[in-house]
């Protein structure tokens, strides 16, 4: 694996996979800095942390998640301090550990009260380390302090109706998402509702029920996709519903979808809006106003939702992509003040108007006023500004060096983290005899 510097042509680093040298790693990403790289080896044998500045490597055995689609659920970096937390599994038991922000040595490791934990995450202020249990084990989210001590356990929503009296017997947490401001946590399960928890109290504050039939109101926008066939190809537009509509369900024609439908929830940059999708209605995006606990908008497409994400800095700007060959090279962008979702057709801007391989779409963290998208395929990429035609020219035409931050990840803004101000690196007084032998470290 090679590491190149975008500003220094003569820089090149080479990393060799010591665990499985003849096999490709399943997951690679940068760590807390540009000189730190995380890598999962094939078959989940090792989780490796490479330090390019010192040419040192630390290996952690038996990471619980190693496949590309789920590896990021198994580890987390604490905002501000850079402490590293990871889930491993040995002899059928979950083990969590917190590592030093510089040396990555174990500060504490313990066995959480889980049967089959499905992920962990820090809150943006770094005050809590969250872990959630498998859906098969019911509703359970653990709120741990930064040094790994259990503070509180959320055991599911309280039944609000008579028909929900056996709610605790159903499947539990399917998806857990923390808001950018750290004040709320959205919890999706196998029902048609989303629970929103207050982080400070670790208690449920609201429940968002997805209705089977949506009635248009002044406060609710319902946009339905329309596809027209022209000589130049398909044209995608959206019309606002004036009558009650039902979200399309899953296809029942016996065909197998390219990807299974997913239940997801994502907060916008202001933490005031929450976008959700459900397995039962895979082609619909729901947008909720958390201040009023009401539905703000419903976006109905003709194809299953592939992905959606809010702009990392600008509030209330949502990007959606859909499954299918007909949607390759198409991106839809919505905001509450627009006249329906905008269609960005970037396939026509690529060479030969073809998408090679898997289409890619992500936000750029641009310092200008207009939102900017990075679009492309496996060979070509382009930038697209969402500024109106009457506005100024494309923002990059007058840009200077260092005006653009090429990032599509989370905002890693330095935050105050008082919970670790008095963190004692010397944990010799803790009893870790039962779990220390589950970690294997190798320095090179």
Functional labels for PLM-detected ranges:
Residues 1-444:
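Long, low-complexity intrinsically disordered regions enriched in Ser/Thr/Pro/Gly
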